[in-house]
Regions:
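Interaction-mediating elements
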Residues: 1-128
């Protein structure tokens, strides 16, 4: 189960939906998550009351098309799987939402089975 947060600057509902689909499709294609395993928070920031900050870190020029993708999932993926995931997210974000790959910033945080509850106050992966 991935938990996905996507933050974009001045994105309308259509663009947010396209970004959410891009990330979900990439997770299904590269990591093998089930298609019905979707937990996402999609947020647009207007640039006034909500902002995104960025610079040209590591020589990557970014602009107001910036998108932050924060993924949380159970541990167990190889570096090669993660690289394939990042690449596919960037490709699909461009295809679905017109977001340039240089503007897609991704973080992936891993944790353990006891760190998830899908409702009822139960850690389903632990109690099985």
């Amino acid at each position: 189960m991935p938990f996905v947060r996507i933050d974009a600057l001045r994105a309308d509902a259509e663009r947010l939906d396209a970004l959410g689909r891009a990330v979900h499709d990439a997770l299904v294609e590269t990591i093998g998550f089930p298609p019905n395993d979707r937990f996402q928070v999609l947020t647009s920031h207007d640039g006034t009351s909500g902002m995104l900050r960025y610079d040209d870190y590591l020589g990557v020029p970014r602009d107001d098309g910036i998108v932050y993708v924060a993924l949380t999932m159970r541990s167990g993926r190889t570096p090669a799987q993660k690289q394939a995931l990042y690449r596919r997210i960037a490709e699909l974000a461009e295809e679905y939402a017109g977001t340039e790959p240089r503007n897609v910033v991704i973080t992936l945080t891993e944790n353990g089975s006891a760190d998830w509850s899908f409702g009822h106050g139960v850690a389903q992966y632990v109690e099985g």
